[in-house]
Amino acid sequence: ANNGTFILRIDDTDQERNKPEWIDYIYEQMADFGLDHDITFRQSERLDRYKEVAEKIGTKTDNGYELDMGEYSMVILRNNGFPTYNFCSILDDYDYDVTNIIRGVDHIANEVKQHLIWDKICEVEGDKTFPVITHAGLLFEGNAKLSKRKGNGTTEDYKDFSKAAMLNWLLKFGWSHPDPLFDKKHPTLSIDEMIALFNEGNISDRNCKIDKAKLAFLDKKWKAMERRGNTAKEVVVESKLLKFDEFSK
């Protein structure tokens, strides 16, 4: 929608929770869903850059390199040479000229820290505009947040569903079109249509509960469309197979 560059960053600096097969799985899932990135990099490949900037803006201590934040200090580079989350994330954004970021509402507190680090980076590397950050609501199953740490946030749980149906299903969780009748007019969208219509200003920061029954309903109708060789519009308008209001309530 912004005609921008899609950057896939692999956060692999936590060595205890980093396995090659997990990274391969990310690439595979992105490809399966047709989410083609323009640039990809791993944070573990940028350790020299993190150290370079940490030495410029931080102070060497027993804990590594720390940044003076006034009332407290923040470790930005550990003694093992690996950066902390907020430091490497915002330095990546700076180096790659990132303009727009979408994160979960659980990262709101991090934005304050990243602003402070960004200002320090700009002092030694040159001024740049801080990215526009939009916070989206989290996905819950029951009363538990979907989380890879808890093992309930993997796409493997949804492998039998149509990828096209899943993308439409996920889009409806936290994004809405300003036209209140849009969903009934366009209950199914292609990836290209999603990109053209998407506006981060219409993202909701409310948490959403997953209802697999609604996904199953959409998946059934989508597969019926594929068997018939129909377009989404033909299924909705002519066959009346899919009524968005049946699964959007």
Predicted stretch roles:
Residues 17, 45-48, 105, 157-161, ...:
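Residue-level detector of secondary-structure boundary/capping sites
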Residues 14, 18-19, 45, 68, ...:
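Poly-acidic low-complexity segments
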Residues 109, 121-125, 132-249:
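Catalytic adenosine-cofactor/nucleotide-binding cores of aminoacyl-tRNA synthetases and other
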Residues 7, 38, 126-127, 178:
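A local structural micro-motif
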Residues 1-61, 109-121:
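N-terminal Rossmann-like or analogous alpha/beta NTP/dinucleotide-binding catalytic cores
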Residues 2-6, 27-32, 53, 87-94, ...:
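Short amphipathic alpha-helical segments, especially helix-boundary/capping motifs
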Residues 8, 55-155:
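Active-site cores that bind ATP or allylic diphosphates and position pyrophosphate for catalysis
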